[in-house]
A protein has these predicted regions:
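Flexible extramembrane loops and terminal tails that flank transmembrane helices
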Residues: 1-18, 110-113
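Cys/His-rich short segments
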Residues: 14-52
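Conserved hydrophobic positions within beta-strands
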Residues: 55-57
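Short, conserved beta-turn/loop elements at beta-strand boundaries and strand-helix junctions
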Residues: 60-66, 106-107
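Short, acidic/hydrophobic/Gly-rich beta-strand patch recurrent on exposed beta strands
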Residues: 72-78, 86, 113-115
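Beta-strand/loop nucleic-acid-binding surfaces
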Residues: 81-91
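Short nucleic-acid-contacting surface segments enriched for D/E, G, S/T with interspersed K/R
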Residues: 89-101
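OB-fold/S1-family single-stranded nucleic acid-binding modules
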Residues: 104-120
Length: 120
């Protein structure tokens, strides 16, 4: 899959129901958010690999408004990169909670959210 830039490729994978991240062939280091070159090294040898879907909550906050509450979380993917997302099905969870990725559609576009382990 090579149509468009890395972000377009990532979104195309999500539309297929696949949570893909990049990995440097030379260092083995995983990369997220999708990029053309690896951070730190500038290597352009990034390949797409399936993410395990596992992560741990690093930080979480709850935004409250008249329309309701929604959390915003930072999770550390089991592969290493940190990702901004939200945790579905709960208002908040303790830091360190194990979560699992799920692809949902919102506003006509697929996105990755997480649910507490055991609720996946």
């Amino acid at each position: 899959m090579s149509e468009g830039g890395p972000d377009a490729q990532y979104r195309a994978y999500l539309r297929e129901g696949r949570f893909m991240i990049q990995r440097s062939r030379s260092t083995g280091r995983y990369v997220f958010y999708p990029r053309v070159a690896a951070p730190g090294t500038g290597e352009t040898d990034l390949e797409w690999v399936e993410a395990s879907g596992g992560a741990t909550v690093h930080a979480i906050t709850v935004n409250r408004s008249r329309e309701g509450s929604r959390n915003v979380a930072l999770v550390d993917l089991d592969e290493g990169p940190r990702m901004m997302t939200r945790i579905e099905g709960v208002e908040t969870v303790p830091i360190g909670t194990s979560v699992r990725a799920r692809i949902v559609e919102e506003g006509g576009a697929p996105l990755v959210v997480f649910v507490p382990e055991g609720q996946a």
